[in-house]
């Protein structure tokens, strides 16, 4: 173990330590120190020893950087592990890749930036662009930060005039640093050997680990990339100075770049020539792109200039435009063929713009004119165009709008027609609403009048047999009747007839209800049934309240007629049976040779057991029949006929009495009316047919030659009178 503070005074070791100190100063940006004599080279640990089987944590050795190219520690990337890694493309431009997200970017991520870079990244960089002049007097622009050169003037950037060639001093310093890189590498290898020998002579001190061959290869590749980048910077600087162009060959370019220290960074001429040719290809492509962009920008500027120029009209010709804009820089910057194409496009644009503006003005005038018409109450749906024009000239609102005075007449007429149509539509809607209101009012009046009729019907004053003349004194005193007189449509009499007709149509239903009531009560209508008794039967039932009294009377008359008809039929049947028995009884008397001298007391014992005798009801009838037969058969027949005639006369009187009391059934009344209508229609049809036949015959006939004119004229008059 060496004691603390022990130092080696070997001159070789001191020299090696000085070289190492120089390299460290270059790496960390520290000022050089004169000597490290009397300073211990290594501080040995006193109470901790690294186990042989455990590798001591070491920091990777610094990259071999030539003098003058040292990287300040504050500018280097942080030592913390990151997902980002730095790479370079074929041109030597660095780019960054994230192995997790697979994202690639030209911009350095914040993770890889040093604290100084982070602090200055948000600050604006002023004066990046400088303007220089080429040998032929053409201006070009150089960025002092990105080392970019272009012909197109950058927009929105502050540009300063370049007084000296850009990056001259920096190029010299960097070139010197790169030139010394090879020598520094050799010195560094000697230092490593000396350090290894010194540490090997020390017992119990582990030797530093050998550098891996892969790291050495990476350092050499990185150094080669930096050397190539410096050589390309040389070419860019000379290009920006106008010394070389993309049309120069290698021999022409060497004359201008061989005196620069950066030219000697690369030893092989083939490498320099290869880099020069690659730079020519890349720069030629950039020049073409810049030229294309410059031409495109010039075209865009010219197009924008022409579109906004007030003299650009749809009718402007190219020759006239060339005379107007011949002195404009934007016009001169574009060749004639492109100018013509841009001019045609601008003419189309101006025509389209003017058309759109004209359409917008037209729509604005139409809307304004429509607003003026809507605000004028004098213009109605009846107003004509001539009247509207006179009213408009007197309107102050229209007089203030001078632009409307020059409005297209056809558009103005169209707007007026639309306004009139809208006014007519509104008028029709108002009229329809008023008509609906009147109809509702009239309907309410009719409904009130109908309620009046229904109230009369419920009281029994209005029935299906009621007459207008009988109820008019009652109806006319009501105000609802008076309201009906002041409105159009159906009159009070019409509604009365409709109501009565509805009651008559209800007769079938009322008749059915009456029959159901009589069946449920077990009542039967006979010829002697009184109407009061019949009405009590119906009204006393719960269903009887729905039956109309007039229909009840008609139904009563119908049932009475049926009962009387049934009684007549029974009487006729009885009379026929009686005549048949009398006939059989006469035959019986004839068999016993009864004559006018015969006595009933003598004949009776002889025939009392006979069927014809027994069929007679009593002895009075038998004796009467015997007397009739004894007096003669003709007398008997004549007596029965006289009885029948008397009965017929009685029946006729009853029918006439019922017809006087309006007791005829509705069915008989309707049948009579139908018969009358059929009879009248048949007679009318026959008369029409006869008249038609006569007229046809009169047209076909012609007066005979033998007839005199006077006779033919009399016939014609007679036919005309018959036709009339």
UniProtKB/Swiss-Prot annotation:
Keywords from the named record: Repeat
UniProt organism field: Caenorhabditis elegans
This protein's record includes keyword RNA-binding: no
Comp. bias regions, Basic residues: 645-657, 693-703
Lineage: Eukaryota, Metazoa, Ecdysozoa, Nematoda, Chromadorea
Name the record gives this protein: WW domain-containing protein ZK1098.1
Compositionally biased region (Basic and acidic residues): 681-692
Top-level taxon: Eukaryota
Gene Ontology process terms (BP): mRNA cis splicing, via spliceosome; mRNA splicing, via spliceosome
